[in-house]
Regions:
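C-terminal nucleotide
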Residues: 1-104, 116-143
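Glycine-rich active-site/cofactor-binding loop and its immediate structural neighborhood
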Residues: 112-114
Length: 143
């Protein structure tokens, strides 16, 4: 089910692309195996990510962009705890945050690929820093 949300203001984003590829099926298999070995830990992480997602939706509906960024940062930590991040994704997340991103997290199936940074007025600086480090970027606005 999709729900149209009136953002009230444009949301500025930069996608950082590692150039690495990973197969979602392999990532799912890896997480499933870890989950069977420690179900309580993984169920807790899954539940926390679900709650962050619902809170993030409320932030979008109410225009709380800074809070959304904080939730993205927390979510990335949980995704990292699920062993879905890579050194390259961690570098991109660090670059984004150290250049003023409100939030940054991996996106997609994990294991490589891409991350997304929530920006304000500093989208160009974040993109330039990622490019300088050798990564491709895709800047865009929503709303």
């Amino acid at each position: 089910m999709f729900e149209e949300i009136n953002l009230g203001q444009p949301i500025e984003l930069v996608v950082g692309i590692t150039g690495m590829e990973s197969l979602t099926a392999e990532t799912v298999t890896k997480v499933r195996k870890a989950w069977t070995q420690s179900p309580e830990r993984y169920e807790s992480l899954f539940n926390q990510i679900e709650q962050l997602t619902l809170s993030g939706l409320e932030c979008l509906k109410t225009g709380k962009v800074e809070e959304l960024g904080e939730l993205m940062n927390i979510c990335h930590g949980y995704l990292n705890a699920l062993q879905l991040s890579t050194p390259e994704l961690e570098e991109l997340v660090h670059i984004a945050r150290s250049n003023g991103a409100l939030g940054a997290k991996l996106t997609g199936g994990g294991g490589g690929g891409s991350m997304i940074a929530l920006c304000q007025d500093n989208k160009d600086a974040i993109e330039a820093a990622m490019n300088k480090a050798g990564y491709k970027t895709l800047p865009y606005s929503i709303g």
